[in-house]
C-alpha cells in the first residue's frame, strides 16, 4: 500500500518575523530546527521508514528534511529536489510584514491575497531584491515560467506535473515517500489528494514540522482520512498559522 508523508518546513526566520516569504530563500529559526528534529522523532516513533525524499529548492525545506531524517536515523535516503515544490510566490508582498500589509490594505484585500484560490498578489518587479529572476537555483528552469507572483491555482498548475511525473511513480513502485515542502505547495497537494473544493481550501492551514500521513490505494486515492503523527500539536499549529498577520 503506497504511503505518503508530508511535512511543512519548521518555523523559518521570516515566519518568526511575520514576513511574507514565498520564494525568498531564508533559513530555519532555532524553533524551526527543533520542530524539524521533532518531526524526525515522530517518524521514528511511528516506525515509518522513508524510501525517497522530495523537497523544494528552498533551504528551509531542505534543512527540515535533513534534520528530520537525521533524527529518524535515515540520512541515507535518496533525495529529489524540484522548484515545482517551492512555496507559492507572493509577488510584491515578498519581504513585507504581514501585520503592516493588513493595516495598509485592509482585511478583505489581505485575505484575498493570502487565501483566495485564484487571485494572486501584485507582481514583483524583476529587479526587486526579493525577485528570483536570474537566481542560479533555477538555471535549469525556463525563465518564462519563473513566476513574478502566484495564486494557489497557479501553484497547483506547476506542482501537478511533478506529482504525476516523479512522485506518483515512486509511490506506485511501493516506496514510502516523504515530501518536505511549504504551506501552500502542500495545501495544493492536499487539495488534489482530498478533492477539496476551491472554496473550502481557503480554510485549510498546515502546521509547521508535524508529519501528515496518507495511506493510498493503487490509484493513489486515500484509503482512509490522512492523519498527523501528533494531532494535538497539529491543531494548535494550524490555529497559529491561521492567526498570522493579525495585529498583536
UniProtKB/Swiss-Prot annotation:
Residues noted as binding substrate in the record, renumbered to the chain: 8-15, 21-22, 60, 87-90, 98, 114-115, 183-184
GO biological process, one term: gluconeogenesis
Localization in the cell: Cytoplasm
Sequence similarity: Belongs to the phosphoglycerate mutase family. BPG-dependent PGAM subfamily.
Catalytic residue positions: 9 (tele-phosphohistidine intermediate), 87 (proton donor/acceptor)
Keyword field: Cytoplasm, Glycolysis, Isomerase
Gene Ontology, cellular component aspect: cell surface; cytosol; fungal biofilm matrix; fungal-type cell wall; hyphal cell wall; mitochondrial intermembrane space
EC number: 5.4.2.11
Record pathway: Carbohydrate degradation; glycolysis; pyruvate from D-glyceraldehyde 3-phosphate: step 3/5
Catalytic activity: (2R)-2-phosphoglycerate = (2R)-3-phosphoglycerate
Residues the UniProt record annotates as site (Transition state stabilizer): 182
A Gene Ontology molecular function term of the record: phosphoglycerate mutase activity
Keyword hit for Isomerase: yes
The keyword Magnesium appears for this protein: no
Superkingdom: Eukaryota
Entry protein name: Phosphoglycerate mutase
Organism field: Candida albicans (strain SC5314 / ATCC MYA-2876) (Yeast)
Note: Has antigenic properties.
PANTHER family registered for this protein in UniProt: PHOSPHOGLYCERATE MUTASE (PTHR11931)
Amino acid at each position: 500500500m503506497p504511503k505518503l508523508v508530508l511535512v511543512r518546513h519548521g518555523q523559518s526566520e521570516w515566519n518568526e518575523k511575520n514576513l511574507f516569504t514565498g520564494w525568498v530563500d531564508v533559513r530555519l529559526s532555532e524553533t524551526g530546527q527543533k520542530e524539524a528534529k521533532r518531526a524526525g522523532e515522530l517518524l521514528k516513533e511511528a516506525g515509518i521508514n522513508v524510501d525517497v525524499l522530495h523537497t523544494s529548492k528552498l533551504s528551509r525545506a531542505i534543512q527540515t528534511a535533513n534534520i528530520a531524517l537525521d533524527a529518524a536515523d535515515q540520512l541515507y535516503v535518496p533525495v529529489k529536489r524540484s522548484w515545482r515544490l517551492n512555496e507559492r510566490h507572493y509577488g510584491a508582498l515578498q519581504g513585507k510584514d504581514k501585520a503592516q500589509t493588513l493595516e495598509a490594505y485592509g482585511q478583505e484585500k489581505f485575505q484575498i491575497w493570502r487565501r483566495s484560490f485564484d487571485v494572486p498578489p501584485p507582481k514583483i518587479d524583476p529587479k526587486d531584491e526579493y525577485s528570483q529572476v536570474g537566481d542560479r537555483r533555477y538555471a535549469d528552469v525556463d525563465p518564462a515560467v519563473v513566476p513574478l507572483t502566484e495564486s494557489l491555482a497557479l501553484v497547483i498548475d506547476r506542482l501537478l506535473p511533478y506529482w504525476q511525473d516523479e512522485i506518483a511513480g515512486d509511490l506506485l513502485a511501493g516506496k514510502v515517500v516523504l515530501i518536505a515542502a511549504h504551506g501552500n505547495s502542500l495545501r495544493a497537494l492536499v487539495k488534489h489528494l482530498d478533492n477539496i473544493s476551491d472554496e473550502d481550501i481557503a480554510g485549510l492551514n498546515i502546521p509547521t514540522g508535524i508529519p501528515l500521513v496518507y495511506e493510498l490505494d493503487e490509484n493513489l486515492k486515500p484509503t482512509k482520512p490522512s492523519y498527523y503523527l501528533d494531532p494535538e500539536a497539529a491543531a494548535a499549529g494550524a490555529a497559529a498559522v491561521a492567526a498570522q498577520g493579525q495585529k498583536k
